[in-house]
A protein has these predicted regions:
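A beta-strand signature from Gram-negative outer-membrane beta-barrel systems
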Residues: 36-37, 57, 63, 67-69, ...
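Transmembrane beta-barrel wall of Gram-negative outer-membrane proteins
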Residues: 128-203, 229-248
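Flexible loop and strand-edge segments within Gram-negative outer membrane beta-barrel domains
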Residues: 186-188, 192-236, 263-265, 271, ...
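Face-selective signature of the C-terminal outer-membrane beta-barrel domain
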Residues: 188, 234-262, 281-396, 417
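Surface-exposed extracellular loop regions of Gram-negative outer-membrane beta-barrel proteins
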Residues: 199-212, 322-331, 390, 414-458, ...
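Membrane-embedded beta-barrel scaffold of Gram-negative outer-membrane proteins
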Residues: 243-245, 251-257, 261-269, 417-425, ...
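Conserved C-terminal beta-signal and adjacent last beta-strands/turns
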Residues: 314, 541-645
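Gram-negative outer-membrane beta-barrel transporters
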Residues: 376-379, 477-479, 493-578
Length: 645
């Protein structure tokens, strides 16, 4: 019913669109738009050191540090590209623009706000990966209903075999509606709705968990499963953001969001204790329907005062969320030994699932913040918050378990211009963040742990080499409780973890023809474990990469207007494959390259793009603390065409 309504609205908007004129999807270019190398998403393009799932070795998404147009958003599922134009990861000096930052960094989703021009964009891509053909088709349109007052946008998307790392075959659909209403000069409202459906149509690939040995050599295509081994989810995001200019210079910003991730009855396969030859114990779990649902939002009042060359801004802020989850209740069955690449054909057995457990989290945070800017001298900020956090967990047959916390949270930051082009910055942040849930091989699988206090200190320099090229060099330290699987396979707190590191960014236009986005992070993720009778053991955490370098280059030869050559080099250092730090994976360097050509055909901007990824077909793995390993994606190619009518 919801999908039909979105389709009907989309077709109506498309039908009333006259001839068009302005580029939208054809002009998307993450390298050209990135301000630094710490993470930028534009449309389907993503570059930089960090992402919504990894910043300084932690996950901002898991921690709960997401924003939509700058306002707090508690994610059950991410808004899709029908309503989301992109995202920016803010750490270091770029995070100082937020009145209430977070220790793990902030990820700010930017909505695809419809404007005052008629535009219909079409994007189609075709990819090749071993025996797979990967398909993607997207249509987006925007229509001004009342010019300068109301514009509406809508989009539809279809993809096939784009989640090949997780499914033997998969398909997905996306739809979205968004509006931009500005009834007068003082009020703006942007409501939106996005829907995504993704499912495995050829079997969910088993998760591979390593034994006490080196990993075997395998690719994702070696991990197969029967067709009935299904997974899927249905995701909804809707809400609005609004700005209202109030009397006496006050500004009100507000956002209210509903995020839903529904998972029907599904299966998950595991190969446990895999040895160096690729043999392990094959197990499959069936889970009853589950969900994650959250209502969240933020109200912010802002008032600025100008005093000559100094500007003072006060923020009064309230954030809240109401989050519910249903999880667990699965039945795990074992099917003996299996060798990767030689999975048996199994008929679906009878599973005995039980009612899932449920948890609710309610949190309200109020705060006050101050920011000062002294032109030519620097800026400084500070904030104080008090949060009320309540989490209730209910298991079938057990009394509910309730936990409460009401800590004070605070942060302070400053940046000083040492010269016209050189600035030094520093900050201290105390926050409360979510730490994730138990992995699939834990006895308390999918159980979320309570939010905990976390700390971050960082400092660094920003140098404006030219007006179009900047360098950032920073130091950081983040402290959190450490949760992992113990010897009884129970996911619980085992100690503390500290990430200390150096991060570098060089981004911008080197010449009129050459753009560079280069970043490096040198990370020391250390665990202080106190689980063995009080004895303290210090180890290196598994998962975070000790040295990561990513360099994106884009060259636009002056001789061919509209042509751009792209290249990306990524270097990952050697890293531990097990929590005992007894085995290491070798470092790896991968190379991506591509070409894009943009021109206007009959007044229609059109972009052609050819990409090749992992061109040298490097074989390696990404490990995590639960002993799961995931192979690098194999060499693959993709051709795409985007046009704005």
């Amino acid at each position: 019913m919801i999908g039909t309504s979105v389709l009907a609205a989309f077709l109506f908007i498309l039908a009333v669109s006259p001839d068009p004129v302005h580029a939208q999807r054809a002009g998307e270019n993450a390298v050209a738009e990135a301000d630094d190398a710490f993470g930028t998403v534009i449309g389907n393009e993503e570059i930089g050191l960090y992402s919504s799932t990894n910043a300084r070795g932690f996950s901002p998404s898991q921690a709960g540090n997401l924003r939509i147009n700058g306002l707090f958003f508690d994610q059950a599922a991410a808004p899709n590209v029908r309503v989301r134009r992109g995202a920016t990861i803010h750490v270091g000096i770029s995070a100082q623009g937020y009145p209430l930052p977070a220790p793990t960094g902030v990820v700010d989703f930017k909505l695809r706000v419809p404007g005052d021009r008629y535009i219909t964009s079409i994007l189609a891509s075709e990819g090749a990966l071993f025996s797979y053909a990967r398909h993607n088709a997207e249509v987006d349109t925007q229509v001004p209903i009342v010019k300068g007052v109301l514009s509406i946008g809508a989009g539809l998307g279809y993809k096939r075999n784009t989640a090949h790392q997780f499914a033997v075959s998969d398909e997905g659909y996306s739809a979205g509606l968004i509006a931009n209403w500005t009834p007068n000069d003082t009020v703006s409202v942007i409501p939106f709705y996005s829907y995504s459906k993704t499912s495995a149509v050829g079997g969910d690939r088993p998760r591979i968990f390593l034994g006490d040995n080196d990993p075997p050599d395998f690719r994702a295509e070696d991990i197969t499963s029967p067709d009935w081994l299904f997974f899927g989810f249905r995701q909804h995001n809707y809400g609005f953001v609004s700005e209202v200019a109030l009397p006496d210079g006050w500004m009100l910003k507000a956002g209210l969001f509903r995020s839903v991730n529904n998972t029907p009855r599904s299966f998950t396969a595991f190969v446990l204790g895999v040895d160096a030859l690729g043999e392990g114990d094959y197990a499959i779990s069936q889970s009853p329907p589950s969900y994650t649902r959250s209502t969240s939002g933020e109200i912010r009042l802002t008032r600025s005062f100008v005093e000559g060359v100094r500007k003072h801004t006060i923020y009064l802020n309230t954030r809240a969320r109401d989050r519910g989850r249903a999880f667990g209740g699965g039945d795990l069955q074992h099917f003996g030994k299996v060798i990767l690449g030689a999975f048996p054909e199994l008929t679906e057995p009878q599973f005995q699932t039980t009612a899932p457990s449920e948890s609710t989290t309610r949190q309200v945070t109020g705060g006050i913040a101050y920011e000062g800017v002294w032109q030519g001298v620097g800026q400084w900020s500070m904030a104080l918050q008090r949060t009320s956090y309540k989490r209730t967990q209910a298991r079938v047959g057990w009394a509910p378990i309730e936990g409460r916390k009401s800590p004070w949270l605070y942060n302070a930051a400053a940046a000083v211009f040492l010269t016209r082009d050189l600035a030094a910055y520093a900050s201290y942040t105390r926050g409360i963040e979510e730490l994730g849930s138990a992995p699939g091989n834990a006895v308390n699988r999918d159980e979320a742990v309570p939010a905990e206090l976390t700390l971050q200190v960082d400092a660094g320099l920003r140098y404006q080499i030219t007006p179009d090229l900047s360098l950032v060099a920073g130091l950081f330290q983040i402290d959190k409780p450490y949760y992992a699987i113990d010897q009884d396979l129970l996911f619980r707190q085992l100690g503390t973890v500290r990430h200390q590191g150096v991060e570098l960014s060089l981004a911008g236009s080197v010449t009129d023809s050459l753009t560079l986005v280069a970043g490096a992070v040198f990370l020391q993720p250390r665990i202080a474990e106190t689980s063995n009778g009080g004895a303290r053991t210090e180890l290196t955490a598994v998962g975070p990469i000790p040295r990561l370098i990513r360099v994106n280059i884009q060259y636009r030869p002056a001789a061919v207007q509209g042509l751009a050559l792209d290249a990306k080099v990524e270097s990952v250092s050697s890293r531990y494959a097990d929590v005992s730090n007894s085995r290491r994976l070798a470092g790896a360097i991968t190379l991506d390259a591509g070409v894009r050509y943009t021109r206007t055909i009959s007044d229609v901007p059109v972009r052609f793009r050819l990409q090749g990824r992992n061109l040298t077909n490097i074989r390696s793995f990404t490990p995590n603390a639960s002993t799961q390993i995931r192979p690098f994606e194999a060499r693959r190619f993709e051709l795409s065409v985007a046009a704005d009518f």
